[in-house]
Amino acid sequence: MAQKLKLEMVTPAAQVLIEEVDEIAAPGSLGQFGVLPGHTPLLTTLQVGEFSYRKGSDVYYLAVNWGYVEVAEDRVLVLVETAETQDHIDLARAKAALGRAEARLRELTPADKEYHNMQAALQRAMVRIQVAGRGGRG
């Protein structure tokens, strides 16, 4: 059994990271899940949420937006729409997006076409704020 996982994360715009890591935690569509070296092969979907990985005693966080995770032979491939490290999140902009989404949701009902889009925007903003607020590694 390998001691490390090879983690690769890709968005349509760029390769976000390639790292040798000790473990990951991801926001699966059916709930949060973790992967350690020697994990059973897996293909699953991700939802908007906080993705983290550990290297030694350091933990790194990213805000991710919908995608897929494939685990095979101590390799974890993550394909997501967007991924932002905590260092790249503009906290003021995320808070402004949260305020806009909250205000717009107060004006809408679940029957409105825009309602679910605004709920998704609210969730993305909340995750970005959470990740940015981590205040550095680990």
UniProtKB/Swiss-Prot annotation:
Family statement: Belongs to the ATPase epsilon chain family.
GO molecular function, one term: ATP binding
Top-level division of the source organism's lineage: Bacteria
Recorded topology in the membrane: Peripheral membrane protein
UniProt-annotated location(s): Cell inner membrane
Pfam families per record: ATP-synt_DE, ATP-synt_DE_N
Function, as annotated: Produces ATP from ADP in the presence of a proton gradient across the membrane.
Subunit structure, interactors included: F-type ATPases have 2 components, CF(1) - the catalytic core - and CF(0) - the membrane proton channel. CF(1) has five subunits: alpha(3), beta(3), gamma(1), delta(1), epsilon(1). CF(0) has three main subunits: a, b and c.
GO cellular component, one term: plasma membrane
Matching SUPFAM superfamilies: Epsilon subunit of F1F0-ATP synthase N-terminal domain
Name used for this protein in its record: ATP synthase epsilon chain 1
Keywords: ATP synthesis, Cell inner membrane, Cell membrane, CF(1), Hydrogen ion transport, Ion transport, Membrane, Transport
CDD domains assigned: F1-ATPase_delta
Organism: Syntrophotalea carbinolica (strain DSM 2380 / NBRC 103641 / GraBd1)
